[in-house]
Amino acid sequence: MDQKDESSSRFWEFYALRYSVGAVLGGLILFLLVQQSQPISSLVFVKSGEPIDLIQVGIFLAAGLVFSYVASAPILVLHAGRFLIQRYTLRLQRPSKSMVWFLGLTLVIPVAFLSLSAMSALLRIWFAVVIFLAVAVVLAQFFIIVKCLLRSSDLYGFYEKLANKRSSAKGGIVDSYRHLREQGNAFGILFFQVVLGLFVFAATMFSSYSNSFQSQSPLEVAVILVLVVLTWILPAALVWLIACMIEKEFVES
């Protein structure tokens, strides 16, 4: 097998590793959402508390693969903005303005919810933690997108150097860091699946918990799910702008 065929084979191995486990976990998360969330179960073919057959298991696995792909959206943004990673020493340093803004904006919504919500203390804490995780994941991606667009020259310089280095390297260090990164991607996707699952559950159940378990119509639940998915994938969709910026720098260089 030549170098090109070997690279292609490993490319598909990386994707198989990344999404095979994610499909199983995604199917499990969707099954739990259907079983535990009455609003979501009203939209699908399986009702809460009912047993499922093998065909439905297969459908859950297929849906879990889609869920895994959607949940992996933040990985794309992190991958695009990896040139922003810097070397830091262990000594304490003053946080940057971006970090201060990020922490402030991430904390303001869950803190406001804790202060203003009329739910019980346990429910307030649970919802606040989920809100914090969701806001942190989404907001961090917007910060990365903005920094990539503002530092387009550094962005292009990184990818240009990377392309030159890779063209002259065969195996060795390239295969090593790719293997490590893809293993990290696989576990990162599992993490983001859990966060997205909590986000979906909290968003669809919030009205029920805040209104004495008043049921929602299927249309209301569908609208909530669409808004959650759009919020989750919007930063990843903006990576298109980063790719166009790299292309523009390439043409003008």
Model regions: which residues?
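Amphipathic, cytosolic membrane-interfacial segments at TM-TM junctions
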Residues: 88-93
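Extended intrinsically disordered, low-complexity coil regions enriched in Ser, Thr, Gly, Ala
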Residues: 38-47
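Alpha-helical transmembrane segments and immediately adjacent membrane-interfacial amphipathic helices
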Residues: 14-39, 53-86, 97-161, 175-249
